Amino acid sequence: MGRIVLVVVIAAAWLLGSCTTAMPPPPPPAGRPAVIENSVGMSMVLVPAGSFRMGSDEPIERLAADFPRYEPERLRSIDDEAPVHEVRITRAFYLGRHEVTVGQFARFLAESGYVPESVADGTGGYGFNPAYDPSLTPRRDAFEGRNPAYSWRNPGFAQGDDHPVLNITWNDAQAMARWLSIREGRRYRLPTEAEWEYACRAGNRTRYQGGDHPSVLLRTANTFDRDSARHWPKWRDDASPGADGHPFTAPVGSFAPNAWGLHDMHGNAWEWVADWYAADYYSRSPVNDPTGPLAGDVRVRRGGSWHSWPFYLRASFRNWNTPQTRYTLVGMRLLLESEP
């Protein structure tokens, strides 16, 4: 019993020591509302122009101490988060308060006639199947696929219209942004990687909104926790602390927003961003409004998902896939450019 109490006390001290005071949302620029609702019911939050320090320079030794289950080689592989560098976002923009939902994506398909790639190419997507054994497959992937049984309609578990849409490709996300742009006569797009991290941090330098310790995720993010671990017992020791009642996706907005009013910037669904990926891009990134490499093979996704462990939910963590990838963890959040 004494050991349990000591662990709790240490964790609490760590949490309190790692928290910083969140920056309050700045007043909106003159003439621009702080929040707008678009023609398909998306709530868009005005993100101000400003500067921030992008990336992470945490020493490997600290990461190894804080995430002891991760192999040193895995920790060394995140050198793409460095160097920490100054970024200036020169124009305010509107960003979706929530990830794009199943219902919003369904409306896009119904009104545009667009066919998502998981359906158009006949190969489907990925999904959860309790009878599927990852150890029997060459990739040892946690999910079954590709399989035509899975798509944005069916990730292998029940979703309501208010859950984040999954199994969409980067190209699908681009198509929805183009459709909305034509429909409303103003430009929608995916955020750049820099815009995404700027909005995620909302003025903070901590790993997660609210602090550095994974315990803060319980109220702010839908992650791989004890509820999810019931379906993947071999990964129970990697789960986030606690249980949030959502073993799979949660309705968007179920968890506390960050300081600028954005929900699910950590967890629920990985979010495609606009940039091509390059491991060394931060060493040559311009200060003003970086947009990533001019070309590449894979596009960046950010934020982690309902199936992510705390290490991968950090604000600085970068991941990537080909633009044609569709997966039961990956969705999107759209940006609306604000008029000057």
PLM regions with names:
Residues R53, E58-R62, D66-S77, V115, ...:
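Functional-site microenvironments in short loops/helix caps that host divalent-cation chemistry
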Residues G2-F143, W170-N171, R178, N204, ...:
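Short, compositionally biased
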